Amino acid sequence: MKHVAKKRFGQNFLTDRAIINSLIDAIAPQPQDCMVEIGPGLGAMTQPLLERLQHLHVVEIDRDIIQWMQGHYPQDKLTIYASDALKFNFGNISDRLRVVGNLPYNISTPILFHLLDNVPHIIDMHFMLQKEVVERMVAAPSSAAYGRLSVMLQYRLHMEYLLTVPPEAFDPAPKVESAFVRAVPYTVLPHPAKDEALLGRIVTAAFAQRRKTLRNTLKGLLDDTGFASLGIDPQLRAENIAPAGFVAIANYLAA
């Protein structure tokens, strides 16, 4: 099939066979796994996944690709959901779900936050993303890439940077490097928040002006007495605080 990549869907099709094999090996699909692929494109990962799985689910928004897949793969092996991944309820497929995908780079962060809402149904996730986004996902405190995305994902997920992928592995070639990442939800949260919505608001406020100190960004939420009780220096910036520190602030305010 000759398919012209559609910019509005952020399409870049993976074509490098050696890299595809490396990704499949990292995912390590087992025959009985319940797996869903987001944005299968022209089947670069779909075909090798189907060779190892009894059945595969895919979520695809492009009607041309859906039509091609319907004529290319047997229905008893592949279930196609014609849907926007940002609106899709992944929990409707299974409570023990493995998620994979070459995510559209233009909506990758919203998809990641949407998947956080589906984490109770997910065993693990493997994604191809813009390298800069993966670096933010796995970033440690006090590093340049560390931010809101790092904190909110690392609160729920163990993150692992697996592989850097060059632009020439895709058609069309993106203007940036890509990377493959593994995200595994914690079965027991290492630092549970009493109020996760409050945690989200605190993290958003703290990073809204990342060059300002916590005393300024959390003004009206936490005073010097609160900082002292938590043992947190109010002169620090958000980028200096580990996820556990933000949870401590949220739990102090929720008490």
From Swiss-Prot:
Disulfide bond positions: none
GO cellular component, one term: cytosol
Documented EC number(s): 2.1.1.182
Entry keyword annotation includes rRNA processing: yes
Residues involved in S-adenosyl-L-methionine binding: N12, L14, G39, E60, D84, N102
Molecular function per GO: 16S rRNA (adenine(1518)-N(6)/adenine(1519)-N(6))-dimethyltransferase activity; RNA binding
Pfam (any one): RrnaAD
Top-level taxon of origin: Bacteria
Catalytic activity: adenosine(1518)/adenosine(1519) in 16S rRNA + 4 S-adenosyl-L-methionine = N(6)-dimethyladenosine(1518)/N(6)-dimethyladenosine(1519) in 16S rRNA + 4 S-adenosyl-L-homocysteine + 4 H(+)
Compartment(s) of residence: Cytoplasm
SUPFAM superfamilies according to UniProt: S-adenosyl-L-methionine-dependent methyltransferases
Keywords: Cytoplasm, Methyltransferase, RNA-binding, rRNA processing, S-adenosyl-L-methionine, Transferase
Enzyme class: transferase
Family to which this protein belongs: Belongs to the class I-like SAM-binding methyltransferase superfamily. rRNA adenine N(6)-methyltransferase family. RsmA subfamily.
PANTHER family, per the entry: DIMETHYLADENOSINE TRANSFERASE, DIMETHYLADENOSINE TRANSFERASE-RELATED
Known function: Specifically dimethylates two adjacent adenosines (A1518 and A1519) in the loop of a conserved hairpin near the 3'-end of 16S rRNA in the 30S particle. May play a critical role in biogenesis of 30S subunits.
Protein name: Ribosomal RNA small subunit methyltransferase A
Organism this protein belongs to: Methylobacillus flagellatus (strain ATCC 51484 / DSM 6875 / VKM B-1610 / KT)
Biological classification of the source: Bacteria, Pseudomonadati, Pseudomonadota, Betaproteobacteria, Nitrosomonadales
Gene encoding the protein: rsmA
